[in-house]
Amino acid sequence: MTRVMARRTIVSVALGLVMLSVTAAHAQKTEIHFWHAMTGQLADALEAQAKEFNASQNEYEVKPLRKGSYAETLTAAIAAYRQKSPPHLVQVFEVGTQTMLLSGAVIPVHDLMQQNEIKINWNDFIKPVAGYYMKDGKLYSMPYNSSTPIFYYNKDAFKKAGLDPEKPPKTWKDVEAYSKKILAASAAKCGFSTGWPSWVMVENMHATHDQPFASKNNGFDGVDGVELLINREFGQKHIGQLAAWQKDNVFSYGGRAGTADPKFVSGDCAMYMQSSALIGGFTRSVKFDWGTGELPHWGAPYKKATSIIGGATLWVLKGRPSAEYRGVAKYLEFLAKPEQQMAWHVNTGYLAVSNTAVKNLEQGYHFVRNPKQYTAFAQLTGLPPTPPAAMQDKKAAPPKPERVATPNSQGLRLGNFVQIRDVIEGELENIFAGKKTVKQGLDEAVTKSNGLLKEFAAANKP
C-alpha cells in the first residue's frame, strides 16, 4: 500500500469514527413525545421551538406530533394513558381543564419542577392565565398558547361608510349603528360575525359583563350541584338581540369554531369577533386595511369586566419511565423563558404569559409598533386601552384602565365542557335559524348541559 493510500485509509477511518460518534450521541438522546393540535403556521412555530431546544443540548429530543383537533388530541391522550402508552406532554384546550384535573393521569407541573429542582417563578405568570389552571394553590399545567377573543374590523369598509377607521365601536349599540351605516353604503354584505360562538358570545359575554355562566363560582368550587345560568336575563337579552340582528344582516352567523373566518377575510362582514391568535394569520391573508378593538359592551347596569382565556396549556402525563421526566421539566423550563414567550407571541399572536415577557415587550415599544397585539393584553388583564409607552412623550394624562377583574371573569371550570359547548352551539343554531325562541333554546341548552354536569359529578365522586 502506498503512503498516499495509507493516509487516505487513516482519514476515512477517522471520519467514520467521527460519524459513528455523532450518530451514537444522537441515538443516546432521550425522546420526549409531545402531542398537540396545532396546524399551519402555528404548527411550524411549535416545531421550530422544539428544534431550537433539541439543538441547545445533547440529552433530550422533543418529538412533536399532531393528533388532530383539540378534542381529538384530548381523547387520544386519555386513551393512550389508559392503554399505558401515553405521550410525556399533551396540549389540552381550556375546556378540558376539569377533565384533566380529575383524571388521575397528570403530574402537576409545580410538582414536576420541584422534583427536578428547577426553579420557576410561578407568581410571574399573568393572573388570568395562571388562575385558570391552578388548584389548591398549585399550577397543574404549563401555560402555553393562551388567547382571548377580540374585535376585528375592516378599516376600508369604515371609510366607505363614513366612519372613523381609527375608532372601533365600544358598545353593542355602536356595533348596530355602524353595521347599518356599512350596509347602507354597500361597504360590506353584513355588519359582523363571530367565530367560536359559545366561547365568544356566551362564555366571554357573561364574563365581560360580570355575569355568572354557571353556579358554584363558575365551577371552581366543586363539581357537585353545578348548573348553567345562561338562560337568565342577560343571556336572553344578548342572544335575543343577535337573533334579531340576524334577520337584517347586521349579524350573520357563520358556523362553529373558525368556519366564519372567510366572512371577514373576504370582506363580506366588516366586523368580526375571534381569537387574538388569528392576528398572525390575518396579517398574511387579509388584503384590506384592518384593525382591532376590545369586545363590545352593553353598558349600564353591567360592570365592564375583563375577558377570559382560550387556547391551551401543556399537561404532563403519568406512565413514562421516571428518568425521562427530567427532560420534560427541562423543556418546560425552556418554554417558560421570557425570550421564548416573547418570540412565541410575536410569531403567532398568542399571548406572552409572564409579566416579565409582557414588560419587556412594552419597554421595547413592541406594542406601540404593533397596537393590534396589545388589544388582547388590555382586555384580558385590565390594562389601559392604549400602551403606556405610547403616552410617554405626550402631555395628556395617561389613560385609565376600563375593565376590572371579577370572580365571574376568572374563568370556567366545568366537567364535560367539550360536550356542553356543543350543546350550547347547537341551540344557538336553532335560535338563529328561527326553529326555537331564545328562551326555548337557552332553556334546552341549560337542561341538557346540567345533565352532562351531573354525569361528570357522578363519575368523579371522591
For the regions a protein language model found, what residue spans apply to each?
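A structural signal for short loop-to-beta-strand junctions that line the ligand-binding cleft
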Residues: 79, 88, 118-157, 190, ...
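Glycine-centered hinge/linker elements that transmit conformational signals in sensory
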Residues: 176-180, 220-254
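C-terminal lobe and pocket-closing loops
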Residues: 278-288, 299-423, 460-462
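Short, solvent-exposed loop/beta-turn-alpha elements that line the ligand-binding surface or hinge
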Residues: 110-125, 168, 211-237, 284-285, ...
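Extracytoplasmic/periplasmic substrate-binding proteins
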Residues: 37, 204, 211, 236-333, ...
